[in-house]
Amino acid sequence: MARISGIDLPKEKRVEIGLTYIYGIGLPTSQEILKATGVNPDTRVKDLSEEEVNAIRDYVNKNVKVEGDLRREIKLNIKRLVEIGSYRGIRHRRNLPVRGQKTKTNARTRKGPKRAIGGKKKK
């Protein structure tokens, strides 16, 4: 079984697709890794030789930021934005959309469920 960056790759899938199970590796990065290591993208993960797995593992460790390191970097970037008080940091702090979307009617995913506001009761 191929284990790269602490992730077990699915045995039955093609290597090109199997690598995308690692956080931080999408299809373009996966293709780049396979081209650099000389592994055929159509090979199934279960058919990889130990040398091919080691070549992929070494390339990923040296050239691609994945899993915990990538998550940590993203978290630190957001923390930095919040600390310096930038517009994006303020949006993160208030749990509002960061990338300029309208919020008058939508943005329910980011804002959470509606909260009822108690109004004046008419007699």
Swiss-Prot record:
Keyword Ribonucleoprotein appears in the UniProt entry: yes
Molecular function terms from GO: rRNA binding; structural constituent of ribosome; tRNA binding
Keywords from the named record: Ribonucleoprotein, Ribosomal protein, RNA-binding, rRNA-binding, tRNA-binding
Superkingdom of the organism of origin: Bacteria
Cited Pfam families: Ribosomal_S13
Gene Ontology biological-process annotations: translation
Chain residue ranges for the region called Disordered: 93-123
InterPro entries in the cross-refs: Rbsml_uS13_C, Ribosomal_uS13, Ribosomal_uS13-like_H2TH, Ribosomal_uS13_bac-type, Ribosomal_uS13_CS
Quaternary structure note: Part of the 30S ribosomal subunit. Forms a loose heterodimer with protein S19. Forms two bridges to the 50S subunit in the 70S ribosome.
Family according to the record: Belongs to the universal ribosomal protein uS13 family.
Name under which the protein is recorded: Small ribosomal subunit protein uS13
Organism in which the protein naturally occurs: Clostridium botulinum (strain Hall / ATCC 3502 / NCTC 13319 / Type A)
Gene name as annotated: rpsM
